[in-house]
Amino acid sequence: MQVIRCLPNQQNLTINLTVSLGRGGEACIYTVPTDANLVAKIYHKPKDAQDNKLSVMLAHPPENPTACLGHISIAWPTELLHSTDGSNRITGFLMPRIRGMRPIIDFYNPRTRRQHCPLFSYQYLIRTARNLAAAFAALHARGYCVGDVNESNILVSDTALVTLVDTDSFQVRDPDSKIVYRCPVGKPEFTPPELQNKTFAECDRIVGSFDFPTANGRYTPIFRYLSRYWRTTNV
């Protein structure tokens, strides 16, 4: 068990560290006993740069393009978690708990799509592409860049709604100080030509660079569907 302080309300929160919902290289995801709609992301080794970056993110959240549908398109930090050992260091944050969604690769892979969601048609793929573009546009409007665009960070529902996760890996630009907190990672297949063979930790991403991964993420599932259609009809 670990006790951490939840800001800005200054309440102490007890997290059970023996059972995690997921584990990554930098952090683990845990349930929040007092709220089933939230999860806590706790860093293995908190860094000072994360403190400032998360504070900027909390102060300047993007718009939610599917708020009218009661859906969360971007799993954004909602509250910061601080250590109670007197250091006041940020150890993680709370964010919405996302349920009933799968990685986008399960939908643009025909075999897994038939297995998990057999009624997910071509029209749903088009709707997924549109919703993904809307989520990216909402981030870009606030100056954020996803950076690490990959299939694991894009979740899709059975009704083609999209949620972006791992948002603390995004490139963040402080609108007040103009400091840029870069995204040091990325997948080659979603990296635009001008950033290939570059050290991401040394590069400021720009919104225009994400026309490439956005197009890739939108049209890969569509053309995979069409290629299967063409193989079965062009005989």
PLM segments and residue spans:
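The N-lobe alphaC helix and its flanking beta3-alphaC-beta4 segment of protein kinase-like domains
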Residues: 45-70
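Conserved C-lobe activation region of Hanks-type protein kinase-like domains
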Residues: 210, 214-235
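Activation segment/activation loop of eukaryotic-type protein kinase catalytic domains
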Residues: 152-189, 193
